[in-house]
Amino acid sequence: MVPEIKKILYATDFSHNSTYAFSYAIDMAQKRDAQIVILHAIEPIPPQIMARLEMYDNQGVLRRARINGGNEDIELIKNRVKEFCKKREAQIGSPCVERISKIVVSFGHPVDEILKTADEERCDVIILGNHGKGFLSHTFLGSVSGGVLQRTRKPVFMIPLPSEKDAVDLGEM
């Protein structure tokens, strides 16, 4: 028997294709009466680069960002998601904001954070956008997509790049 899909992890880097993949997450959630957990993983900056950046950080922006722990990012993401849902609801009429159960901003390697969040939130499936950049894209998956596929036992939906007419956007981050 195929397990029920009641919770979906939608992992995003806010690239053009990941926002297109969000449409698939919303559609799947609506059809299956499921909830969506949105994850945005921020990869840590290597120490040697961070040291250089801090030399030029006169106003303490980097320090405040570390202390803040992503709270501003979560609010920004929530606002972008609400804007996207309003546009989508105007197009198709069905609501989408109530399908989102949680928004997570985490700091760490994206593959590790996706797998950890999928387990912690008890998600049934994972939805990722597949960038498909370059002439070898038909042979190799992106490092995040490939890493998730290799290390998870959960179903993973890889959403390919949209055509320009199907493109959607959550706005500039």
Regions found by a protein language model. Name each.
Residues 1-3, 45, 83-126, 163-173:
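Structural beta-alpha unit
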Residues 2-67, 173:
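Small/aliphatic-rich secondary-structure junction motif
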Residues 4, 116-168:
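Gly/Ser-rich helix-loop-strand patches that form or flank binding pockets
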Residues 20, 113, 135:
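Phosphate- and divalent-cation-binding pockets in alpha/beta enzyme and binding domains
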Residues 61-75, 97-100:
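Short glycine/proline- and acidic residue-enriched helix-loop micro-motifs
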Residues 71-87:
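Short, surface-exposed alpha-helical segments at coil->helix boundaries
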